[in-house]
Amino acid sequence: MTSSRGLGDVYKRQAEARGGQRGPENVWGSAAVGAFLALLIGAGVEPRELMLVGFAASFAAKLADTFGSEIGKRFGRTTVLITSLRVVPPGTEGAISLEGTLASAAGSIAMTLVMLALQLVPSWPVAGLVMLVGLVATLAESLLGALVQDRVAWLSNELVNALQTLLAAVLAMLLMEL
């Protein structure tokens, strides 16, 4: 646990050295799954519609996470650990708030509506699935943060973000096949 805290301090110092701005590792952690699916779509891999749904879900989950984290930290009145509902300080790995969760839902909805408008999501029922998966993957990311992230030194925020978007894409694609 001490090593993960030390690693967290390293990442914090790196972010502070950049004036709090995100680095390339943040972009890859957030967009690698979507970028990979976009490459597959561009290469003509079939079924295209399934890949598009995975693409949309990965970005719906990412925007849900961003909205939930930022709004939850700033405006969350009561922050609780997702595993125990014990009150914890804002910003704690695995912490959620009502305000942050509602913001996560709004982020997933917003990105899905953009994908629907761009005709990357084929219908309203599929859009509903993408919206739901975006929120579920965000809550799963909080669960992963609460249960594992502080205990595993190499499990960075960027890797957790990549796992979240992967979960969203895979879950949406699997549910489309049902």
What are these regions (language model features)?
Residues 1-11:
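Single conserved hydrophobic/aromatic residue that forms the stacking wall/gate
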Residues 144-166:
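Interfacial loop-to-transmembrane junctions
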Residues 26-38, 99-113, 164-169:
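Core segments of transmembrane alpha-helices
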Residues 60-81, 139-143:
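Short helical (or helix-break) motifs at transmembrane helix termini and adjacent helical loops
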Residues 13-67:
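Hydrophobic alpha-helical segments and helix pairs
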Residues 109-151:
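Glycine/small-residue-rich hydrophobic helix-like segments
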